[in-house]
Amino acid sequence: MTKWKRANPNGTRDYLFEECTLIEEVEQKLRRTFLERGYEEIRTPTIEFYDVFAFQSRPIDEEKMYKFFDEKGRIIVLRPDMTIPLARVVGTQRCDTPLKVTYSGNVFRANESLAGKYNEIVQSGIEVIGIDNVRAEIECVISVIQSLQKLRVQSFTIEIGQVQLYKCIVKKLSIHEEEEKFLRTYIESKNYASLSNFIRDKKLDRCDETVKLLEKLPRLFGNLEVIEEAEKLASSNEMKMAITRVKEIYEAIEKLGYGSYISIDLGTIQHLDYYTGVIFKGYIYEIGEEIVSGGRYDELIGNFGEMLPAVGLAVQVNQIVKALQEQQEPYERKRIDIMIHYELNRLAEAERLRNLLQKDGKKVALSLFSNLNDTFQFARKNQIVTVVEAKSESLVEYVWKEKWVVQKEGETSCVTFKLR
């Protein structure tokens, strides 16, 4: 029964000290940037009813959810996604729109063992709800680019894709649901050989414009030249409109001076089925991991109430932290500047002194040791060079200079002592 008591479940890990501080800083900087741009915060429970994620299209694989029962026998899940609970809130609360919201929290999704992915991650994101024009997508992309700049993330790019174009192709070529799952994988992984074999096995006419577009789809990545290629092969107004939307977003962001942070990839297809239009994926070159994901989901909120257009982007906080650790100087947690050793009957005075000293920007801590020598040893081990002793009769400041020496000694009043 105690076999696993010293281990973490698959796909989880402990975060210690500097890394915890860095995660907190990343979350706070993202939150601050989004709030400054007019987003309002929403928080949803870590646990949700299974039914929240089990509507008709089944956007999240049931096997990837952590499920258990509540006290009434109802199925509960650890939230595997942040967008769907937000859609539930907006759909059931009948919020006024347009609405810009931000969130941050942990997401739990069971990945395959040894896949190198964590099953618990931290996501911070934004959603623009109630707007169906390109201003919503543009707002989301600008917000995320600015937040990554403020975090000093280097060498990142956000790819703009269009799942609506892919869905138009699938519909026009009458590709069945089971076959489509394989097709999606071939395009996403840019597996040209398997895609070519798929077209051959399906006996699709390679002279047909839509088939040509399908075969080219994984190769359509880069800048606006990609759009020109796709437009030549678009065989319906719906396809042309889908391509034009990507073009409008790209051009608008480029004109703002953010062209170096964006690219087009019409072979990008999100694994979550609730996306209906433009989609986004962001990467950092050095780590090759996805740091941003999202897109337009105009039909999702309708599962919980009124049908509302919406678009959103999620930032993978853990991956950002990993990138910052690799790109920047090793993060050093702020050391304690002053340690206060006190006799128990001087606790109140010691705490007042701690409050006074920390107002000068110092990191000040009360000693946990009853013996002054133990406090000295702890201070040396942790590179603390100043110890203040709160004695019954006086306050004494010690400084390390190859040994502990008295720097000053004074009245019992912490205010007077600080001013000396």
UniProtKB/Swiss-Prot annotation:
HAMAP family: HisZ (MF_00125)
Protein's name according to its UniProt entry: ATP phosphoribosyltransferase regulatory subunit
Pfam families: tRNA-synt_His
InterPro entries on file: aa-tRNA-synth_II (IPR006195), aa-tRNA-synth_II/BPL/LPL (IPR045864), HisRS-like_core (IPR041715), HisRS/HisZ (IPR004516), HisZ (IPR004517)
GO-annotated biological processes: histidyl-tRNA aminoacylation; L-histidine biosynthetic process
Listed NCBIfam families: hisZ_biosyn_reg (TIGR00443), PRK12292.1-6 (NF008938)
Assembly: Heteromultimer composed of HisG and HisZ subunits.
Metabolic or biological pathway, per its Swiss-Prot or TrEMBL entry: Amino-acid biosynthesis; L-histidine biosynthesis; L-histidine from 5-phospho-alpha-D-ribose 1-diphosphate: step 1/9
Gene Ontology CC: cytoplasm
Lineage: Bacteria, Bacillati, Bacillota, Bacilli, Bacillales
Amino-acid biosynthesis is among the record's keywords: yes
Keyword Amino-acid biosynthesis carried by entry: yes
